[in-house]
Regions:
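Phosphate-binding glycine-rich loop
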Residues: 30-77, 91-95, 101-103, 168
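PLP-dependent aminotransferase-like
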Residues: 68-157, 164
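Solvent-exposed, non-membrane alpha-helical residues enriched in polar/charged side chains
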Residues: 19, 23, 41-45, 64, ...
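Conserved donor-binding loops in enzymes that form glycosidic bonds
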Residues: 7, 132, 179
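N-terminal "arm"/small-domain region of PLP-dependent enzymes with the aminotransferase-like
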Residues: 1-30, 35
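Conserved active-site segment immediately N-terminal to the catalytic lysine
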Residues: 155-180
Length: 180
């Protein structure tokens, strides 16, 4: 097997800082909704250029919460791409909605925006673009289509945290952004 990255080497490069931060949280005894979580949320919102950031258990939970917050419910349709981790579609199904898939492009493996409009029906309530491999989907086109059809945009940026699209961070351009 050819490893794609060396996580031990990555850890070693910031070991002291990570160990100190983890020990601070452990010694505080405050793991949920504590001072460290509040500080992280504030700093991460600043980093992403958003007003808020809310820490939750995992990326799937973040997507489910975002879908519910955007009013997506049973029987609604949500357009996304099949080129993603299964939790993108799983989160749509978890709220009782139906995932509607568009293909990805052969050069970026991101959502093929040319296919979005043909998938929109009266049941469509949202689009979940998936940012992958440190690249952002074409958010100008996606947001324009969403605005035209009055759809919500929920960004799945779990695989592109810190990625940049025309000066904006992944997860900061739609109605909600989910990063894990």
């Amino acid at each position: 097997m050819i490893p794609s990255m060396n996580v031990v080497r990555q850890y070693e490069s910031i070991r002291e800082e990570l160990d100190q931060a983890a020990l601070e949280v452990l010694h505080s005894g405050s793991y949920i909704l504590g001072e460290s979580v509040e500080r992280f949320q504030t700093e991460f919102a600043d980093y992403c250029g958003t007003k808020y950031a809310i820490g939750v258990g995992n990326g799937t939970d973040a997507l489910v919460i975002a879908l519910r917050a955007c009013g997506v419910k049973a029987g609604d349709e949500v357009i996304t791409t099949a080129m993603s981790f299964f939790s993108t579609a799983e989160s749509i199904a978890a709220v009782g909605a139906i995932p509607v898939f568009v293909d990805c492009t052969s050069d970026t493996y991101l959502m093929d925006t040319a296919q979005i409009e043909e998938k929109i029906t009266e049941k469509t309530k949202a689009i979940i673009p998936v940012h992958l491999y440190g690249q952002c989907a074409d958010m100008d086109v996606i947001c324009s289509i969403a605005q035209k059809y009055k759809l919500k945009v929920i960004e799945d940026a779990a695989q592109a945290a810190g990625a940049d699209y025309k000066g904006k961070k992944a997860g900061s351009m739609g109605d909600a952004g989910c990063i894990s």
